[in-house]
Amino acid sequence: MPPALRPAAPSRSLLRYLRAQSEGLSFAPTCRAAAERHPALQCRHGCTAGGSTRPPRQPSSSTTTRSLSTATPPKRTQLRAGLVDLEAILPKSLRKQRTTKSLLALPPPAGSLRFSSNQSSDCDSKRPKLREWLFGNGEKKGPPDTRLNDDDIRVALEEESGSIFQRRALTAKAAMDPRLRCTEVDENGNVVMVDGELKKSELIAKYGLLPRDLRKIDSSNLPHILIRPSAILLNLLHLKVLIKHDCVLLFDVYGSKSSYPQSAFMYDLQGKLQQKQSSGANSLPYEFRALEAVLMSVTSELEADFEAVRDPVIRILSELEDDIDREKLRVLLVLSKRVSTFEQKAKLVRDAIEELLEADDDLASMYLTEKTHDLYRGEDDHTEIELLLESYNKICDEVVEEASNLVSSIRNTEEIIRAILDANRNSLMLLDLKFSVGTLGLAMGTFLASWYGMNLENFIEETNWGFAMVTSVSTVASLIVCWYGLVKLRKVQRVKMGDLHNRNAPNHWFRDESTDVLLDPSNRERLRRINSMKSAQQKRSTSKKWF
């Protein structure tokens, strides 16, 4: 949020000029009453603000002819500006302070038109002039002045005017401070806080994190495993977990799309943390048990997602072997995208674990319980955590390999379908060429017959065998042209990799010895596809023998 704008304060020279004008046009009774209430306003030689050098009158011993009534207090006069009201400029919090302290502590101004005429020369000599008020006096004598200077007034104005905007800005900033919903599990496996909201600043201060660490939890979908001096931060698939030596913090448990897997993880985590660990050498510390629960949940989720993707893919691939349909191809396209996304997700999880395994200093820093007892391990002393991470890394690697095999099966099926479609396209083109050759033969016969039908005199019309001869010659010419075209077309069609039947002959230099390999159960699908391709090729060869 941008900082609140502060209004510009009046300049120093403007304030001095306004003060001089206000004091020059003030009334004498106000200054005199102020001098009577505050003796500090009296001159050093005993003169009051009114300028009288006489000592104060003593009350007469005789009885006074008039008695003063004290029922109502005297009305308090205040200093007012003649041209500009300074109280309208000042904020409310400084008005009383100025009227009671600042204005009464000011020395009597020079140039006052309402002062009494019986002022002493000492007070006139001590009274500052208009030039001194405007430009200041270089010499400072006597005790320090207690009146407010221009800097104090300017600072007070800025603070008063900006305090409201500052309070509003701080309130808006506090309201916009992002919060994270989390569930906390203590060292005994008991849930101490369910769906609680914590500010990011509180998490940073309480658990010793950095702001960039919370950003990876809040806005990043890439798997991360961060090792900090006093915490382990994990962002793996549906889990965003903070592990300490005595507590586990799970973020966004309820209300999210993956609430069910996170709830199942909470039950598994409580079961692992509530197990009584022996004090032997093989016992795992608190943070390792929590980390194992996280990795187990992540790998289980990966396997469940893979099972949900693999079954429809295998089904649609088997259906495409029998019939290539447009709707089936569309379903295969959707499943192919889904499998590719899953493969990428599994690779990211595997890479995150492998990256942690390659960092020896991070592995040694994961012993949080020992750090609380001031025990620090060397960079090569991390056998327990390394074995734990390697076991789950192998599981992730297996899932990635199976996903890669499934993707390769989809790619092979797509290539086979593309080859079949190309073969069908070639068959259609071949049929078109055959019709073109037949049309050419008929055109040749028609061309010969057109000579006989011309309206010209020739000896053929006078004979009895003319019609039969022209018909037979046209037919023979058409057949010859068709036979020649089909022979040339068959030679063009023979441009292929060769006959598969002759390769298995005893004298052939190449022999396929991969039959035993194809009998393996993992390659049965591949063998079935090869047999179907051979049967389809045999059918096509038998249908073309009449040419």
UniProtKB/Swiss-Prot annotation:
Record flagged with keyword Hydrolase: no
Low complexity bias (residue ranges): 52-74
Transit peptide: 1-75
Positions of short motif YGMN: 452-455
Compartment(s): Mitochondrion inner membrane
CDD domains given in the database record: Mrs2_Mfm1p-like
Top-level taxon of the source organism: Eukaryota
Transmembrane segments: 428-448, 467-487
Protein's GO biological process: mitochondrial magnesium ion transmembrane transport
Self-association state and partner proteins as the record states: Homopentamer. Forms homooligomers. Interacts with MFM1.
UniProt function note: High-conductance magnesium-selective channel that mediates the influx of magnesium into the mitochondrial matrix. Essential for the splicing of mRNA group II introns in mitochondria by affecting mitochondrial magnesium concentrations, which are critical for group II intron splicing. It also suppresses a variety of mitochondrial intron mutations and its absence may disturb the assembly of mitochondrial membrane complexes.
Name of the protein this chain belongs to: Mitochondrial inner membrane magnesium transporter mrs2
Upper classification of the organism: Eukaryota, Fungi, Dikarya, Ascomycota, Pezizomycotina
